[in-house]
Every structure is written in structure tokens, then in C-alpha cells.
Amino acid sequence: MTEREAMFYPELAKDDSLALHTDLYEINMMYTYFKKGIADRNAVFESFYRREPFGNGYAVYAGLEHIINYLKNLKFTESDLQYLKENEGYDDDFIDYLRNLKLKLTIRSMKEGEQL
């Protein structure tokens, strides 16, 4: 986390790992891909919102730096892995896969500040 992000997101600065700050569905899908042997295939994911904020009919794109930093630093800590194993029942092979996870990404994005 950058110093700037820590200033604007102080609650996140307390947490070494944001890997579990997701819907369990996403981790279940990772597990399914892993068990089917397709975890390393290319995949496409999107980040979006459902409605314009504040009901004003438009939005301004912001936050790309935050997304890039999150993805660059994404890792599962040992406490994350222990939680997933003990509470969600994932097997040791998947836990090891998460422990050694290295993302290979191409990010396509709107420009920061563009109106949506």
C-alpha cells in the first residue's frame, strides 16, 4: 500500500492482506478452476458498478492506481490460508497453490478521470 493510499484508506493500512476481502464465490471459482486443471488458463474479469452513483446519470472513472497496486501486491498470508483450510475445507494442494500464487496480468482500462 502506498503512503497516499494509507492516507485515504486508513482502515486498509491496518491489514497486511486484502486477499480475503472478496466474496467467497470468487475463491470457490478459483478452487473449481484449480480442481479442473484450468487455473492457469487465460481468463477475463471486469470491474464495474450497477448504477450511477448519487443518481446523477454519469460517473467519473477513478481508482486505477489503487486497483493496480492491489493486484501487484495480492498475496494470501499464512493466517488467510489457515482460515481457508480450517473454515472452508480447501485441500492442502489448493492451499499451496494460493500460497505460491503469482498473477500474470494485462489490464485494459479507461483513462483516469474519464466520464462514464
Placement of each model-derived feature along the sequence:
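Ordered alpha/beta subdomains of enzyme catalytic regions
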Residues: 1-116
